[in-house]
């Protein structure tokens, strides 16, 4: 099979299974790097590939999953040499069977900013080096797998596209709740990966076939019927005794049968699967054809955690725009991100579903500022963004660092703009707004605007932008200056919807500029536009009249099924007159000085800043409170309760890892102010307890452990982080020398569970007065108990809960 035939096969292709599983069975030594075996034991690696090929695999992943500069930093072999050897071994094994050799690429093992310290462009560069090495070695395709961070997957996809012309398959790993470790949804993955040019997308690792199936079904529903989809589930879950996985090859094949209905392009296995598993898949997929019946594609934009389906009127918050706002312009010139973030948070709370982002102001570097603002916004809010600029460089800077699928606002009918901006939208997978204007300006007649819109639509389709990603703005003119043209906008909008089959968008509030009681005009015009077919309304979400019109319209047009969203928003609302009476009563019964109920206490603004991840705001609020309150009082009465609130929401699944980490970052900003205040008073900083944490010997994965450290430190604990691949004796000696009474151990791989057990045994044998908590993807509560741990912590928040319980704080 040739790479150019990959997506024209009449039947579902079989992928391979677990390389790590096979190496472990072959006696891989603890701490050994599997990728170095490409050079030190090529016969072993080639034989494993050959067994998979003989079992029916026609895409074989080279033994390069962990081959990155980050993970091979202290290897005696270069990245290029390891990849070259890995591809060569794979191609030799593939040749007799006509199989393809894939450059297997996994995560770098380090969190990207803002959740970690790895810069996005550094990640792109590191992946670019990997891809170039694979191309030079003769890889037939690139297989990106086991990603949990959509931002890192974007970096990898850009690197593949910018450094090769090879086909690329992209896969993420999802947890049982339907999101990745960092909170990414299946739908956000589908929209983003497809937009960035992945040739096929899939789900691998984490769970078994039965658990992955509902997510795989959602993946197919989020993509065109012809778009290739694949799966590589685990052989179930790890056994509690660490002896392998709990699904046999026969049961695996049985649980894979429902996938026949999904029209998979390819199927294989991941952790715990062997050639015997793949052999049985031949019978499951022998007569299966890839692809599914076509279905109408939804118009979506997304961040990792929030995929917005533009079904019904969707509200785009307009407030991140400096036009006519002196305070906003000043904030942009001064680089005051706190002001921008406050606008984003307030619009989110008011009900915006997408945020328009415009940073064009006199005296600013718009491209640099667009990049800075996009990074800042996506570190705090989860809403998708609409990048609002006519400046191509500013758009590209924002598009490149955006995590998800955004909207570009905008392009117009001028040939130069079309030729410049549409390719950017295509490269970065963005939806696009087309303004019904060209070199002649805004034309008064509706039919002329529709003609421009048709030209924009046709150009976008020719550039490879799907129909569902094209939005037309027929341009709102002010009623005060061009009253006679107001209806033309509505008529043009309706015609675009009916004749061109595109989505529509309007900046609604422009209609009332220069007139009194603007909300009356805005709401009425919004209602007219909605009836004409408006999809996206750029407006102020703090306008209760306009928001009420949106929610009511979606009910009355049967878009809000069972009035669910309307009831959720308005069930507990009271009429304005009743609200006024209640406010007067509240004023008469205001809490006395010293009383601090949650809604009225002096700590509420600080707690909110922490909860929302606003580091600058949290620091400013802390400085103000320190003028009246004792430093440690702020810790106990505001910061810890705020972190507890965030932690509770994290456990309930109403917020996710990025928000948890940003809340911790905001709390850290407050803690720095508190430490300064304590130092100025000549007092020592009081630790709530000392904890040693480490990733055990042989395991080089430390993302989870690093997250635990951040959370523990923000709860006021002193953390001694020993790093990764930590020898048993180092843990024991540190606990003894530092007089530590709580230890946290982490392991991600089944091969290092024995090392964790040995570390726990050594701590017990040394008769040290300490308790031990353990965590990691391969651990279970039962196995933790079996190896002598005192607690199993499923995540960073639970680690903090254990520490609080242990130290009695």
Task: Outline where the language-model segments fall.
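Domain-level signal for soluble alpha/beta catalytic cores
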Residues: 1-473, 477-809
């Amino acid at each position: 099979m040739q790479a150019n035939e990959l997506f024209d096969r009449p039947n579902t292709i079989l992928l391979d299974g677990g390389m790590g599983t096979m190496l472990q069975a072959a006696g891989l030594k603890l701490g050994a790097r599997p990728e170095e075996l490409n050079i030190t034991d090529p016969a072993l690696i080639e034989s494993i590939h050959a067994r998979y090929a003989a079992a029916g695999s026609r895409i074989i992943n080279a033994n390069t999953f962990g081959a990155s500069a980050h993970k091979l930093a202290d290897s005696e072999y270069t990245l290029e040499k390891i990849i070259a050897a890995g591809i060569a071994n794979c191609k030799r094994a593939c040749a007799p069977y006509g199989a393809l050799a894939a450059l297997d690429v996994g995560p770098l093992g380090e969190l990207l900013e803002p959740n970690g310290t790895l810069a996005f462009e550094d990640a792109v560069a590191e992946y670019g080096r990997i891809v170039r090495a694979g191309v030079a070695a003769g890889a037939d395709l690139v297989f990106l797998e086991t990603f949990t961070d959509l931002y890192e997957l974007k970096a990898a996809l850009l690197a593949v596209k910018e450094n090769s012309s090879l086909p690329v398959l992209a896969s993420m790993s999802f947890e049982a709740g339907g999101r990745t470790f960092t909170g990414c949804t299946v739908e956000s993955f589908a929209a983003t990966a497809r937009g960035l040019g992945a040739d096929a997308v899939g789900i691998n690792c984490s769970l078994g076939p039965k658990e992955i199936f509902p997510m795989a079904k959602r993946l197919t529903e989020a993509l065109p019927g012809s778009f290739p989809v694949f799966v590589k589930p685990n052989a179930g879950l790890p056994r509690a005794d660490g002896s392998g996985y709990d699904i046999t090859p026969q049961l695996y094949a049985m649980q894979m049968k429902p996938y026949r209905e999904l029209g998979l392009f390819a199927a294989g296995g991941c952790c715990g699967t062997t050639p015997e598993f793949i052999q049985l898949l031949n019978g499951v997929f022998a007569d299966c054809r890839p692809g599914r019946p076509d279905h109408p594609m939804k118009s979506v934009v997304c961040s990792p955690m929030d995929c917005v389906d533009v079904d019904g009127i969707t509200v785009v918050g307009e407030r991140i725009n400096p036009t006519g706002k002196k305070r906003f312009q000043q904030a942009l010139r001064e680089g005051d991100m706190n002001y921008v973030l406050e606008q984003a948070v307030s619009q989110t709370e008011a009900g915006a579903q997408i945020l328009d982002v415009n940073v064009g102001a006199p005296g600013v570097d718009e491209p640099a500022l667009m990049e800075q603002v996009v990074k800042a916004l996506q570190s705090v809010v989860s809403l998708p963004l609409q990048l609002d600029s006519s400046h191509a460089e500013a758009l590209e800077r924002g598009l490149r660092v955006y995590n998800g699928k955004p909207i570009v606002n905008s392009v117009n009918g001028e040939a130069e703009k079309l030729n410049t901006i549409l390719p950017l939208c295509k490269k970065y997978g963005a939806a696009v707004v087309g303004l019904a204007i060209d070199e002649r300006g805004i034309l008064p007649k509706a039919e002329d605007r529709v003609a421009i819109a048709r030209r924009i639509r046709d150009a976008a389709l020719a550039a490879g932008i799907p129909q569902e990603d094209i939005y037309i703005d027929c341009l709102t003119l002010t009623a005060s200056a061009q009253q006679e043209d107001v209806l033309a906008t509505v008529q043009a909008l309706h015609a675009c919807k009916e004749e061109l089959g595109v989505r529509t968008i309007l900046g609604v509030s422009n209609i009332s500029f220069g007139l009194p009681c603007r909300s009356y005009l805005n709401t009425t015009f919004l209602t007219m536009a909605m009836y004409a077919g408006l999809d996206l309304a750029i407006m102020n979400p703090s306008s209760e009249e306009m928001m009420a019109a949106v929610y009511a319209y979606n009910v009355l047009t049967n878009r809000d099924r069972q009035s669910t969203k309307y009831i959720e928003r308005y069930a507990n609302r009271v009429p304005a007159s009743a609200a006024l009476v209640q406010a007067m009563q509240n004023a008469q019964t205001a809490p006395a000085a010293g009383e601090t109920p949650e809604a009225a206490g002096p700590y509420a603004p600080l707690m909110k800043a922490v909860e929302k991840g606003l580091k600058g705001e949290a620091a400013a609020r802390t400085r103000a409170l320190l003028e009246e309150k004792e430093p440690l009082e702020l810790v106990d009465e505001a910061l810890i309760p705020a972190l507890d609130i965030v932690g509770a929401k994290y456990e309930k699944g109403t917020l996710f890892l990025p928000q948890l980490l940003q809340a911790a970052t905001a709390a850290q900003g407050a803690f720095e102010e508190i430490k300064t205040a304590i130092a100025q008073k000549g007092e020592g900083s009081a630790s709530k307890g000392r904890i040693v944490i480490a990733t055990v010997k042989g395991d080089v994965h430390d993302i989870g452990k690093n997250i635990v450290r951040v959370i523990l430190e923000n709860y006021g604990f002193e953390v001694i982080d020993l790093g990764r691949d930590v020898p048993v004796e180092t843990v024991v000696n540190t606990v003894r020398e530092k007089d530590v009474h709580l230890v946290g151990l982490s392991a991600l791989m089944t091969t290092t569970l024995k090392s964790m057990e040995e570390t726990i045994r050594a701590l017990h044998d040394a008769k040290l007065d300490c308790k031990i908590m353990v965590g990691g993807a391969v651990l279970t509560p039962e196995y933790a108990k079996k190896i002598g741990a005192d607690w199993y912590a499923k995540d960073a928040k639970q680690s903090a809960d254990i520490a609080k319980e242990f130290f009695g704080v």
